[in-house]
Amino acid sequence: SNNNIIESPFYQRKEVVDRYNGLILNCGKEFELEFRAYDEGMAYRFISKYEGTYKIINEQADFRFDRDYRSHLAYAPRGGADGNDRFNSSFEEMYTETSLSGIAENQLIMTPTLIVGNEGKKLCIAESDVISYPGMFLTRTEDYSNVLSGTYASYPEKMAPRSWNDSFYKMENYADYIAKCDGVRTFPWRILCIADNDIELLSNDMVYRLASPSRIADTAWIKPGLATWDYWNNWEGQGESGKT
């Protein structure tokens, strides 16, 4: 069990209560599977114990539902195309409401994705602590109408300059794996946030709590003020700023 306070001076509240029950399953010499159960949901992640270099061919994350629930989701703008270009997105799409069976087959869905269950209870599929690893999209296949499966872009092997309005670099060649790793590490959290109503979703801190702690030891120099498109101006994918 864990019951700590996370200092969060730059979050929507000054402190966040981090209370959960945890379990780590030892799956042999090379990896572990960690679970955490919160009052507001649950999460799991893989932990690698392998000390050499290795590649992640794929990750299977299936979210299976017992019936055809309603969902609120956003399709990736190129999500119906073939190949890895379909993952190229500015993440600015509108959400739509549909049943699970009404989701377009093999169309990429962005996360977070919201499922409306019995008595209006909400279940939100999300992720956290995505470092040097592709973000998770979701897809529904024809054979499994009530199942949403994690889908990931392949690792980019070659990039070339491209116009500013899409990306500074275009991926020209992709590998047959999704990530390259070196040594012991943790992988992204797969999260299920649970709420009785929409209001509770707004105060759910699971994504924040499951993220890695700040790497900046001294934050006293950070002052309130205005910033201009820091996410845009640092996106060229080169150097340390493009590590993720």
Regions found by a protein language model. Name each.
Residues S1-S203:
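N-terminal accessory beta-strand-rich subdomains and adjacent acidic, glycine-rich linkers
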Residues N165-S167, A175-T244:
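An acidic-aromatic substrate-binding cleft motif
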